[in-house]
UniProtKB/Swiss-Prot annotation:
Organism: Archaeoglobus fulgidus (strain ATCC 49558 / DSM 4304 / JCM 9628 / NBRC 100126 / VC-16)
Protein name (record): UPF0212 protein AF_0282
HAMAP family: UPF0212 (MF_01223)
Stated family: Belongs to the UPF0212 family.
InterPro entries hit by this protein: UPF0212
Superkingdom: Archaea
Pfam families, A to Z: DUF555 (PF04475)
PANTHER family: UPF0212 PROTEIN MJ0068 (PTHR42199), UPF0212 PROTEIN TK1194 (PTHR42199:SF1)
Transmembrane intervals: none
Length: 113
């Protein structure tokens, strides 16, 4: 059975952030705390989005009045899955059970050689 790299995105709310950089750091740290020590192999990063006007890449963070919405990306390797859909379900289940109130969406599933 093949192995897969599953990429998920999540919307993370950060309260009392002093800056956009602060919000990004807090979001990654809080997500890491929820996943460790069980899933310390999951890579966590802030996602990117494109500017609607000039199409240049921007970090996926929106901040108003000290409250930020940070788009996080989770990358997880899933071994011995039956199909890409099965790998996505496994990754979403494993990450989701540690973050029950965080919305997760699968954005990519790629087979690993």
């Amino acid at each position: 059975m093949p192995d897969y790299l599953v990429v998920l995105q999540a919307a993370w709310i950060v309260r009392k952030a002093r800056s956009v950089e602060d919000a990004m750091n807090i979001a990654v740290a809080e997500a890491g705390k929820k996943l460790n020590p069980d899933l310390d192999f999951v890579k966590i990063d802030v996602g990117d989005t494109a500017c609607p006007k000039c199409n240049s890449p921007l970090k996926a963070v929106f901040m108003v009045a000290g409250v930020a919405l940070v788009g996080l990306i989770f990358e997880m390797k899933v071994f011995n899955a039956k199909s890409p859909e099965h790998a996505a379900k496994i990754a979403k289940y494993e990450i989701g059970k540690r973050m029950p109130r965080i919305p997760l969406e699968v954005i990519e599933v790629a087979e690993i050689e």
